[in-house]
Amino acid sequence: MDRKELELYLNDLLQAARFRDYCPNGLQVQGRDPIAHIVTGVTASLALIEAAIDVRADAILVHHGYFWKGEDARVIGQKHARLKQLLAHDVNLFAYHLPLDAHPTLGNNAQLGALLGIQPTGRFGDDELGWIGTLPEATTLGAFAEVVAARLDRMPLVIGGADRPVHTIGWCTGGAQGWFDAAVSAGVDVYLSGEASEQTTHLARESGVAYIGAGHHATERGGVRALGNHLAEHFGVRHTFIDIPNPV
């Protein structure tokens, strides 16, 4: 398919223009045309780029791309190494950050909720990026944490008593521990995100709302993989999801 056609389709599907983001969404590095093979991954790391080159991908589609607000604009060091490989092999790089968190079916939050068996009931936070939902049956924090560990193949950080009853879940993938306060105000029993900060522990203890830190990378694998599968089905392109392990 044509590179411009893909970019326009993704921008429209993910409603990229409506988000005030920390980075440019869409095509970040131009490569060859046409595009027949797309590799997806969470972050445009050098390891992902090299893996995509090895399988002869025409484009890479990620959640974490480049050119973040406030970063050093010089093309040196790590940035040089990554861009050098993309440009030398004429590989396109597409990146969608907040738009890929928010999509109602393909987004990170939608995919994580489905993976954990949560029925969505509402949203909260800026651009309604935070999600609220309920479990089919009330359970305990310990039992729910076991489900999280099994589905994400990673032991989560759990703040709260294992026997605490939970039914209403708030969640936002990635580094959204800063939205814990908003989740508490929304009346959830437990809030789940990817990371935790020092103050997260105190808020959990003092609010009575449990917290689960399930991994920034682990909670954000679903969206880009689902989006790649959608593109393969819609356009008939080849799609390969490559997971570069990350313990954070």
Curated annotation (Swiss-Prot):
Instruction: Tell me the residue numbers annotated for binding a divalent metal cation 2.
Output: 64, 216, 220
Under the heading NCBIfam families, the entry gives: YbgI_SA1388
What is the name attached to this protein's record? GTP cyclohydrolase 1 type 2 homolog
Keyword annotations for this protein, in alphabetical order, are:
Metal-binding
Q: Which InterPro entries match?
A: DUF34/NIF3 (IPR002678), DUF34/NIF3_sf (IPR036069)
Offer an example of a GO molecular function term for this protein. Answer: metal ion binding
Instruction: Read off the Pfam families from this record.
Output: DUF34_NIF3
Family to which the UniProt record says this protein belongs: Belongs to the GTP cyclohydrolase I type 2/NIF3 family.
Q: What are the binding positions for a divalent metal cation 1 in this chain? A: 63, 101, 220
Q: Which domain of life is it from?
A: Bacteria
Where does the signal sequence lie? none
A GO CC annotation recorded here is: cytoplasm
Q: How does it assemble?
A: Homohexamer.
